Amino acid sequence: MTNSLYLTTTEPRCGKSLVSLGITNLLLRRTGRVGVFRPIIDQKDTLIRDKNIELLLEHFNLKMDYEDTFAYFERDAIDLMGQGKTDLIIDTVIQKYKALESRFDFILIIGSDFENEESAFEVELNAQIAKNLGAPVLIVSRGDKEKISDVQNVVRVAYDTFTNTGCEVVGVIVNRTDPE
């Protein structure tokens, strides 16, 4: 079985790109066979590539076709969810992921971006995907809130959502904190 990690965020601009660069760099020190997979990408135009995927593929010269790195465009996944076809989304994601397992020793799975009003659905869907892929979860959050309790609350909600779904949360990274 391929090792994996599901990287998810609590909100936009948490520093997911930086964290994914660091994790991939560490992984490549241990194995040359690292893959990247984003179950759902938020590109509106199919001609524009996902910036997180593209960054990792180019920076580390990963041996993957771009088309193999994702399962759905966000708009298509939202349409299917609206039709009550969440199971189809999960099944397709599993199928695409399984196709990568034989090619890589480790797959970094990157969750969706939370950049629109459907983000409440995204947390739940990310948790379902992580659970069904059997991937441990690393949560990335922002620390640039007015009160520490606000940061704690956001992290707690994400943590509870994933653990209540049956996922193993292996850690939390809080970026953009005030050093004071």
Residue positions per predicted region:
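Short loop/turn segments at strand-loop or loop-helix junctions that form parts
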Residues: 72, 110-113
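Conserved catalytic-core segment of NTP-binding enzymes
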Residues: 112-180
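N-terminal phosphate/diphosphate-binding loop that engages ATP/GTP or pyrophosphate donors
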Residues: 4-100, 118-119
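Glycine-rich phosphate/diphosphate-binding loops that line cofactor/substrate pockets in enzymes
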Residues: 1-2, 97-103, 132, 164
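Loop/turn-to-beta-strand initiation segments
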Residues: 33, 102-109, 136
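Generic structural motif recognizing short loop/turn segments at the entrances and edges of beta-strands
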Residues: 1-3, 151-152
